[in-house]
Amino acid sequence: MIWVPSTSAQQEFLPSPPADHSLIYVLDQQNKLISLPFETATTPLRAEQVARSTSTSYLELKGEHSATVLLATQRIFLFTIDRGGAHPPLLVWLTPHRGARRVPAIAQRGIAGFAISSSEIVRPIPRGLAKNGDEVFMELRPRVSLMPGEYAIIGNDLTRVATFRVIAAAD
């Protein structure tokens, strides 16, 4: 007699790409993609202009906490462009500051836009799931479970910052 283990219980569910490519999604407990709400970040940096000198400042989101609460292991999905010079939105750790949430940002001399301080970036394991031309539907999974705290997924558009918080699991 030969016993063949079932692989269906061991396989991870991979969602199909949703119709709206502009949103950022998480997978709920019923394996449905739920979109994260966006907030608007502000910064004293003039991100639309070429910086005359390198300066460090911040991106700020109003309010002490995000309204969205996720589990530390919740899976994040989004669409991004796959071509040289483009990077997917960044998953970053936010710190509280006088009733708001902030992340350090840098404007580099001679370049328009901003960069996030590398110490605040949560290094993900990107996993491409579907490709259509230059566009890729991907999963961003942190390398380790997220610690309790405030997080944001930040791309180039400061009016479209997805935020969430992770709270400590109840024992």
Language-model segment annotations:
Residues 10-112, 155-171:
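Primarily secretory-pathway and cell-envelope proteins
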